[in-house]
Structure formats: structure tokens, C-alpha cells
Amino acid sequence: MYAPGGAGLPGGRRRRSPGSSALPKQPERSLASALPGALSITALCTALAEPAWLHIHGGTCSRQELGVSDVLGYVNPDLLKDFCMNPQTVLLLRVIAAFCFLGILCSLSAFLLDVFGPKHPALKITRRYAFAHILTVLQCATVIGFSYWASELILAQQQQHKKYHGSQVYVTFAVSFYLVAGAGGASILATAANLLRHYPTEEEEQALELLSEMEENDPYPAEYEVINQFQPPPAYTP
């Protein structure tokens, strides 16, 4: 009797069919968290560039809007002379700018981890547990807190130096403040997308890596099985 050709390979090894040669691998990339991360980066960069951070009304200050761009580098002496701000307010706005820069760096690093999905254990843990996104959220919350503090200081200064006696003085938040709040919200969404995603266990990852290495080290090409299937059976021998 004879065995039909193509049933197996020498040494009793069987090959996977061509349609099922790919192993199910868990990609480390995450588009669901990369998109909110990109929105967070854009919002923080726009908030830094936008001059409107606080609206001022009713004081002697000739400016109606103040922002962190007014205190980066050279500070116009007229802002201090017109009682638009004081040295403490300048320091607070610079601290706000510093936290915005840190938020951009953290959000950018989180975005790169989500897009490229590195396999290094430390980077993998950092991405899966969304450490960079969480830091971005904390920095946005810090910026919001310092912004409120700066608005209270500016409001107190404007009330001491009203434009007219009996003028209504108020200070409100402008575009940049809400952009930072939106960046924090986007980072929260990115954090949720990473933390709620299902990942394989360590044993499952090791099994997938072992199967992948076995396939890569298989010396028999895929064409061997196809050719072997069409070989004629050997001649009958009694």
C-alpha cells in the first residue's frame, strides 16, 4: 500500500495551509488613543500661540486681552505701568507657559508611542497604562488652576485701579483657557482608550512569539507543499 502524496512533510512535520500562515498578533499601535492625543497637542500649541488668555474690562489697563505670549521673553513696561499686571502675575503666566510646554512634550511622546507601538517592555508598559496621557491631564489641570489664580490677582488689581469711579470690573477666561481644558479632555479620552483596551497575557504573548519564531525558522517553503500535493502516487507493489 502507499500513502497519498502531500499528506505531510519529511520527519512527520505538517505545514499550515497558505491561507492560514499568518499568526494572530496583538498590535501595539492604537489609533483610538492616537487621534485624541493629536488633538491635545494641537490644542496646547494653539493655546500658547493665541494671545487671548484673559479678558479684562473696567480697569485702567489699555489692553482688553492678556496671554502668556505677553510674558515670554521681553515684557512690555506699559503692561506694568498701566496696571495690567504685576510681577506676581507675570511669574504666574510664565509658570502657566512652562506647564503648557511640558504638556506638549508629554502628549507628543504619548502620541508617538501610540502610533509606532514599540515592543520594548518599558515603553510597552508606559503606553498600555497611558502614563504620558495621564501626565498631560495633570498638567492641563495645573494650568487651569494657575489661570484661575492669575485671574483673581488681575481682578483685584483692576478693582484697585478702576478706569472710572463706579466702573464695573470683571476678568473672564478667553480662548486659550478653553483650549487647554479641551486638551485635557482629549487626553482623558486617550487614557480611557488605552486602559479599556484588551491586551493578551504574558503567557499568550510568549506563545505567539514562539509560534512566530517557528514559522520563520521553517526550512520548507510554501511551494513545497503545493508541488507535493500534485505528485503522482508511487507504482503499486505487491
Swiss-Prot record:
The keyword Transcription does not apply. The modification Phosphoserine is found at S17. Its main location: membrane. It is a multi-pass membrane protein. Residues 1-27 are annotated as: Disordered. The modification N-acetylmethionine is found at M1. GO terms for cellular component: early endosome; plasma membrane. One of its GO terms (molecular function) is small GTPase binding. It is found in: Cell membrane; Cytoplasm. The keyword Disulfide bond does not apply. The chain crosses the membrane at residues 96-116, 130-150, 169-189. GO terms for biological process: endosome organization; negative regulation of cell population proliferation; negative regulation of TOR signaling; regulation of TOR signaling. Pfam families: TMEM127 (PF20517). InterPro entries: TMEM127 (IPR033331), TMEM127_TM (IPR046795). Residues 1-11 have a biased composition (Gly residues). Keywords: Acetylation, Cell membrane, Cytoplasm, Membrane, Phosphoprotein, Transmembrane, Transmembrane helix, Tumor suppressor. Belongs to the TMEM127 family. Controls cell proliferation acting as a negative regulator of TOR signaling pathway mediated by mTORC1. May act as a tumor suppressor. This is Transmembrane protein 127. The lineage of its organism: Eukaryota, Metazoa, Chordata, Craniata, Vertebrata.
